[in-house]
Amino acid sequence: MTTPRSLPFRLGMAGYTYHKFSLDETLAALERFDVHDLCVKDFHLPLTSTAEQIAAFKKKCADHGVTPYGVGPIYMQTEDEAKRAFDYAAALGVPVVVGVPWKPAADGGKGWKQRRQSPELCAKVSDLCAKYDIKVAIHNHGRNPATGAPALFGAPADVWEVVKGMDRRMGICMDIAYTFADGFDPAAEIRKYASRLFDCHFRNISDPANGSSGTDSANGKINYYNVVKALADVGYEGACGIELANAFPKNPDWIPASVGYFRALMDAVARG
């Protein structure tokens, strides 16, 4: 009998999955599903929270057996906004900010699809990484203009090109669904950018060309066994956050189904 190997990463939850739910509802659900790691969004803990509010938040999480593993995505347009994100992460005690340094389009548009990646702000964020010893994982948003935001770090390669010469704590939050929908093999991308991979968002899609077409994780088009195996093979040590925001809460069964599916894949990979 093969002895299962111990996988270095954990299954968590992207906070945005519960953007229509209160913190209490979110933590109760995570406890029910035996998920212990949460990437915190600011609708559950505002960026302007006081030290007392942050302490109360951490206690409430602990009471449900949940540990914040990161914060974000946080969209930052200025150096002051970036510094606020780092102060927030430091106060919460998390090692990574899922961040998106951006600037408006030339026509001044600030809508999600009109935002542009900002290498200039990334350079300042890189300095903050060194100052705070906190990682930044930049979230890719898809290269297809119909379903993503190609000018806002469309693919992991677009993040890499900006951060590769910056502080080693500047890296990637790989949205697996957008990566796959853009025609990339997510497992190969994980192996390629492993040295700067600091977070993963696990989503599956029903339409292989549409990175926004949500479905429960077990019934989509992405081969997640290969994704999980790649993460294990490269020694990825972060969390993998399940993200189902586009389809949830209309399909509440998708959350436990996805948790069970990914746990089964992790067990299969561990057993070789």
Which stretches of residues belong to each language-model region?
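Histidine-acidic metal/acid-base catalytic patches
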Residues: 2-15, 19-36, 90, 153-272
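Active-site acidic/histidine proton-transfer and metal-coordination neighborhood
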Residues: 3, 24-25, 31, 37, ...
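Glycine-rich, proline-tolerant flexible connector loops at the mouths of alpha/beta enzymes
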Residues: 39-58, 110
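Vicinal oxygen chelate
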Residues: 44-47, 74, 212-215
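Short glycine-rich, flexible loops that bind phosphorylated cofactors or substrates
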Residues: 47, 106, 209
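Catalytic-core regions built around general acid/base machinery
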Residues: 52-63, 120-131, 189, 226-230
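Generic hydrophobic, helix-prone segments enriched in Leu/Val/Ile
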Residues: 53-54, 67, 135, 215, ...
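Alpha-helix boundary/capping detector
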Residues: 56-57, 86-88, 115-116, 257-258, ...
